[in-house]
Design a protein with these regions (language model features):
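Eukaryotic acidic, Ser/Thr-rich intrinsically disordered low-complexity regions
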Residues: 260-263
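Extreme N-terminal leader/anchor segments
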Residues: 1-58
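Aromatic-lined, polymer-binding surfaces characteristic
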Residues: 61, 71-252
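Alpha-helical protein-protein interaction elements
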Residues: 4, 21-22, 56, 66, ...
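Short alpha-helical hairpin
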Residues: 47-65, 74-79
Length: 264
């Protein structure tokens, strides 16, 4: 059975914007690569490699509390779900192979059954991981069967609610990823007020991270480059949703010029 939905036949088509998952597949974590199917097949066999850590072998169910390498970064990546996108991409590229879609859907709902209401869990709801996971959950909307779609929307709404909560918001690049997640899910849910709030907060965060000349407050040179790419991705997401940036975009380009001067 082909689990990749025909969105034109859905009763949900007016309540959400299915253009969002299509156009928000931007950035290196969310775009296809030649090795996608090989990696996805490995994951379905129970092999998960979260760089730079060694391979982890899991059974028929993912052990969400696992910490095999005693590494916070590993558990962060596990709960961020960015590793799951290779399965989503393979499911959408090979709809005749329904096992990929089933795995993606099962993983999303399995995680949600355990952690959706455990918002104080120190790992599952880590800042930045929550924003990245939200993006992944939105991008796979076409894979969710009709009989699970209402529950799926509840999962997204809960993520949107938590990302919109100022008390859970952090600064820096972690906050940047939280706000990108909020922008994407608000756009998908057609929540224009929340979408505008995410955009406003993104610009506010940018203004707190960059001075008027486009210099980032992060001291390390490597982070100047990372921040440029992260912010460029965020600005791309805003523009994909029809939000113009004006002076903020120009200041980001100025920061790129500063970086070029540093490395001369």
């Amino acid at each position: 059975m082909n689990l990749v939905r025909d969105i034109m036949s859905m009763e949900w088509v007016e309540s959400v914007d299915f253009g969002v998952p299509a156009r928000q597949q931007v950035g290196s974590w969310w775009t296809p690569s030649p090795s996608d199917r090989e990696i996805a097949e490995g994951i379905l066999r129970g092999n998960l490699r979260l760089e730079p850590h060694p391979n982890w072998v899991f059974g028929s169910q993912i052990e969400w509390d696992a910490d095999p390498f005693n590494q916070r970064n590993w558990t962060f990546q596990l709960h961020s779900m960015k590793w799951l996108d290779v399965v989503r991409r393979t499911a959408e590229q090979s709809p005749e192979d329904s096992e990929f879609a089933r795995f993606w859907v099962h993983t999303v709902f399995d995680w949600s059954a355990r952690y959706l209401n455990a918002v104080d869990h120190p790992v599952a709801w880590m800042d930045m991981a929550d924003g990245m996971r939200t993006i992944e959950f939105v991008l796979g909307a076409k894979l969710v069967p009709d009989d699970l779609f209402r529950e799926y929307l509840d999962i997204l709404r809960l993520h949107a609610e938590k990302l919109a909560d100022p008390s859970r918001r952090v600064g820096g690049n972690h906050g940047l990823h939280q706000l990108q997640g909020l922008l994407v899910v608000a756009s998908f849910l057609r929540d224009d007020e929340l979408k505008l709030s995410a955009a406003t907060d993104l610009v506010g965060l940018f203004n707190s991270e960059y001075d008027v000349e486009g210099t980032n407050k992060e001291g390390a040179l490597a982070y100047h480059d990372l921040n440029y790419h992260w912010w460029q991705l965020a600005f791309d997401r805003l523009e994909l949703e029809g939000i113009k940036l004006g002076s903020a975009s120009r200041r980001l380009e100025d920061s790129r010029k500063h970086l070029a001067q540093f490395v001369r």
